[in-house]
Amino acid sequence: MLMHEKLMAGQFFDLKTDRKPLMHHHQYQHHQQQPLHHLPHSQLPVQGSLGLPKMDLYTAYAYQQQLLGAALSQQQQQQQQQQQHQQLQQQHTSSAEVLDLSRRCDSVETPRKTPSPYQTSYSYGSGSPSASPTSNLLYAAQMQQQQHQQQQQQQQQQQQLASLYPAFYYSNIKQEQATPTAAPPKVTPTANLLQTFAAASAAAAAAAAASSTNSPRPASNASTMQIDVLENPLSPAVEATTPTTSSSGEAGKNTRPFKAFPRDPLVIAANFAATDVLLDNPRVERYTEYRKRVLEQIRSSNGGSRTVTNPKMRRTNSRSGSVNEGSSSNNNSESEDRAAAEESSDCDSQAGNFESKSATSSSSNLANATAANSGISSGSQVKDAAYYERRRKNNAAAKKSRDRRRIKEDEIAIRAAYLERQNIELLCQIDALKVQLAAFTSAKVTTA
C-alpha cells in the first residue's frame, strides 16, 4: 500500500488506538517483505516508497503532488507531439493532392491579406482546408477520426489518473454522475406547477367570461323599456326590472348613448328628481297630474296615439289599423296571384312540352322560350318578396326606436315645463312673502 493511497483512504489518523498510523504502515511493509522476495524483479515495489513512512504528513502530500504534476506534464507533451504529427500528415496529404477546380477560392492554404467575403471569422487564416466551413463535408471522415482519437486519449488520461489517485478521482466521478440525474426531478415539479397554474387561470378566465355573458348589464335593460312603464312613472321597481329575459340576449351588444338613460323619467329630467320623490310626496303627486294632462293633450293632437310617424300627416289609430289591414290583405292577394301565376306558368310549360311532341320544331322553341321567361319572372318575384319583407322589418324596427326616442324627449320636455312652472310659482311666493314681511315690520315699528 502506497503513501498516497493511505492519504486518500484516511488511515493516517487512528482515533481508536491513539497511535501514529505511520508506524502501522512500517510494520505492515516489514511483514510483507517475505512474500515480496519471491516476486520477479518487474513486480517489486519502488525503493523510494520504503522511505515514505519516515516522512511527515505534509512532505508526503508534497511528494504526491510532484508525482501527479510530472505525470500530467508527460501526458501534455505526448498530446502536443501527436497533434504536430497529425498536422504534418495533413500538410503532406494536401500538398500531394491534385488541383481540384470544384473547390472554392477560400480553401487556399495561403491566407490572404484582405479576407474574402466567403470567409468567416473562423475560416480566415486557417492553415488547413479542413478548417474552412465550406469544405467540412469533404473532411467529415477525418474529423470523426480526430474526435475518436481525442476520446481515446481522454480515456487513457482518466485511467492513469485513477491509478495514481484512485479514491479522490472515483469519488468525483460518482458526484458528477449523481448531479445530472438529480437535476431533472427538480425541474419537473416546477413545470407541473406552472401547467396546473396556467390551467387554473384559464378556467377562472372562462368562468368570468361566462358569468359576464350570462349576467345582463344595467345599461342594456334600458333598451327594453316599454311605453306603459313611461306612462306610469310611479310603478314599483319590481315591475321595472322584470323584462330581463329579452335583454339577456342583447348583453353582448353595445347600447346606444340615448338608450343608456335610466328608466325613471324623473331622473332623466333633473338630477334632484330622486330627492323630490324621497322628500316631497305632494310635489310628486302634482307632477303626475300635470304629466297626465300633458299626455292627454299630446294624444288628442296626434289623433289618439302617443307619437306620430310623420308630424305633417295626422293619422288616427283606426286609419292606421285599416291601412295595416288593407296592406296585409293586399299582400295576401298578391301572394295568391303569384302562386296562381306560377301554377299557370307550370301548366303552360307542360302543355307546351306535350304539344312539342306532335308539333313542329318552331312551336317547341317558342314553348321553351315562354317556359324560361316564366321561370325567370317567378324567380324575380320571389327575390322581390324577400327584399320587401326585409325592408318592412327594417322600417318597423326604425319606427320603434324612433318612437322610444321621441317618448324620452317628451318626458324631458314635460319635466322641464313643470320645473319652469314651479320656478315661477316659487318666485311669486317669495315676492308675496317679502311684501308681507315688509308690511309686518312697518306695522311693528309704528306700534313701537
Curated annotation (Swiss-Prot):
Residues 298-310 have a biased composition (Polar residues). The keyword Endoplasmic reticulum does not apply. Residues 407-414 are annotated as: Leucine-zipper. Residues 384-447 form the bZIP domain. Residues 23-47, 83-134, 238-259, 298-363 are annotated as: Disordered. Signal peptide: none annotated. Residues 390-406 are annotated as: Basic motif. Residues 100-112 have a biased composition (Basic and acidic residues). GO terms for cellular component: nucleus. GO terms for biological process: anterior/posterior axis specification; axon guidance; negative regulation of multicellular organism growth; negative regulation of transcription by RNA polymerase II; posterior head segmentation; regulation of cell size; regulation of gene expression; regulation of transcription by RNA polymerase II. SUPFAM superfamilies: Leucine zipper domain. Gene3D superfamilies: 1.20.5.170. InterPro entries: bZIP, bZIP_sf, PAR_bZIP. GO terms for molecular function: DNA-binding transcription factor activity; DNA-binding transcription factor activity, RNA polymerase II-specific; RNA polymerase II cis-regulatory region sequence-specific DNA binding; RNA polymerase II transcription regulatory region sequence-specific DNA binding; sequence-specific DNA binding. Residues 30-47, 115-134, 318-333 have a biased composition (Low complexity). Represses the expression of both the krueppel and knirps segmentation gap genes. Binds, in vitro, to the krueppel regulatory elements CD1 and CD2. It is required in the early embryo for the development of portions of the head and abdomen. Homodimer or heterodimer. This is Protein giant. It comes from Drosophila melanogaster (Fruit fly). The lineage of its organism: Eukaryota, Metazoa, Ecdysozoa, Arthropoda, Hexapoda.
